[in-house]
Amino acid sequence: MGADNELSEFEKQRLANIAERDALLKKLSLDAQSSGLFPPKSARSSPGGQTKPKKKPPPKKVKKEDEHPVPRRMSSRLRGLAADSEVAKRKADEQYEAAQQAERAKRVRKSDAFSFSEMLVSGQKLSGDSLIGVDVVTKGVAMPYQRTFGDEDIKKTTDKELKALREEMSGLRLWEAWEPNRIKLTPERIYTMTFHPSEAKPLIFAGDKMGNLGVLDASQEKPTSAVKQEDDEDAEDDDPDPVLTTLKPHTRTISSLHIHPSKPTHLYSASYDSSIRELDLEKTTSVEKYAPESTSDDIPISGIDMAPDDPNTLYWTTLDGAFGRYDTRASRRSAVATWQLSEKKIGGFSLFPTHPHFFATASLDRTMRLWDIRKLSHDDPVPVGEHVSRLSVSHAAFNSAGQIATSSYDDTLKIYDFGSKGIAAWEPGYTLSDAEMKPDTIVRHNCQTGRWVTILRPQWQANPQSSIQRFCIGNMNRFVDVYSSSGDQLAQLGGDGITAVPAVAVFHRSTNWIAGGTASGKICLWM
């Protein structure tokens, strides 16, 4: 027991000494660290034997005052400044007005006479003899490429004359010299087209949205050197485009073109710039034939027509719903007569060719109206009769047989036969009842053109070679449809290379040539 107690006392003393020594060493270590003699103990090493360095705390950012501080937004009152001066305000108003006036100036019509060089936009110089020839100087949904009329319909035709005409019209083929997507006749969307009356060669005129006039002589042939050989890979790059001419006689949309058959060297064009101009195809000059007295008067013209027996009198309609007449041989002040026929725009009109005192109008107010100039009051004009459609009527086209074809946004083509009702013998003041004004034939046709396609309008052939009257109209499925006056479809013209809707479709007045114009300024020609 004694030994155990002694060891125990000894052990206690030893432990006390160890504790005292450790305390002394710890005190010395702390004193040394505080004086900077030794670095602090390193962190424990990781299991892999590598020590992980401690992240250094980011240095404290000391906010420095900017030598040139950015001024804060403050009101003029807090800055102690006076309100903007009247001079500054007036200057800003003048700059704005100048910009607006410059924009308006681009759209104001030019009343001066133009030479060819002043109108030329692109293409070759026009030559009167080579251009027109010696003989002339004398609601549906569009389904692209889906046909609604074809060979099977022709085979089922029992009427011999109708079948022969269907075969003839369906036999028309696209101009082979160039594909339609190569024939860009105008820079912008085509609004109107017409053929020159010459039968010697197809000569086409097209007016676009910006006042450009395109001219194409389709008798030209592709140069033989440009014909691509099967084994020549580079021939396509050398293939020239057709020779075209582009003029700019107007500052705004050309809405209508007309060539009088007894005056074939003169082309009349009507425009939204409120003017009607005459282009002399021999002299290649353009002069203004009609316009409001002031250039500031904005009266866009929507259509133009002339009586076959009178090459001097112009008839027109406006987007304001007015109808006008002017004998170009007299002064404008005394010879211009106008009638306000509608509160809304008249989109299209035409004269009855054989009795031009009758004319038909199509309006945004959903009406097709028949008028007689012999009994037309300026104060309260009353039509011979009118027919109201479900939606707006785009155009009303008269043919030589006294029939009117209209297109409407209710997706119908309507045909009114006033020839069978004795229109040629009607006396001034004759009127028709609502029942007598109903259409004789209604054809379903998709007329939903939308914003980017020109409105579809029917156009008759002026002098057909057979007793069957016929008209053409664009088809939203990228065709041109041909119908008879009884509503029978005669043809549906298409072909390779037609990449857009040929919305503007026109017949040559006597030959079975048909042209269609697209929103990209390109044309298709069937012959």
Curated annotation (Swiss-Prot):
Superkingdom of the source species: Eukaryota
Question: Which SMART domains does the protein's record reference?
Answer: WD40
Q: Among its keywords, does the record have DNA damage?
A: yes
**WD repeat residues:** 185-226, 249-289, 296-336, 341-381, 388-427, 450-493, 496-527
Q: Where is the composition biased (Acidic residues)?
A: 230-241
Q: Which Gene3D superfamilies match?
A: YVTN repeat-like/Quinoprotein amine dehydrogenase (2.130.10.10)
Question: Which BP terms in the Gene Ontology apply to this protein?
Answer: DNA damage response; regulation of DNA damage checkpoint
GO CC, sorted alphabetically, is: chromatin; cytoplasm; nuclear periphery; nucleus
Q: Where is this region: Disordered?
A: 32-98, 216-247
The question of whether Transport is a record keyword is answered with: no
GO MF terms on file?
DNA binding
The transmembrane residues are none
Q: Which UniProt keywords apply?
A: DNA damage, DNA-binding, Repeat, WD repeat
Indicate, by first and last residue, each region the UniProt record lists as having compositional bias (Basic residues).
52-62
Job description of the protein: DNA-binding protein that binds to both single- and double-stranded DNA. Binds preferentially to UV-damaged DNA. May be involved in DNA-metabolic processes.
Family membership, please give it. Belongs to the WD repeat DDB2/WDR76 family.
Please report the name of this protein according to its UniProt entry: DNA damage-binding protein cmr1
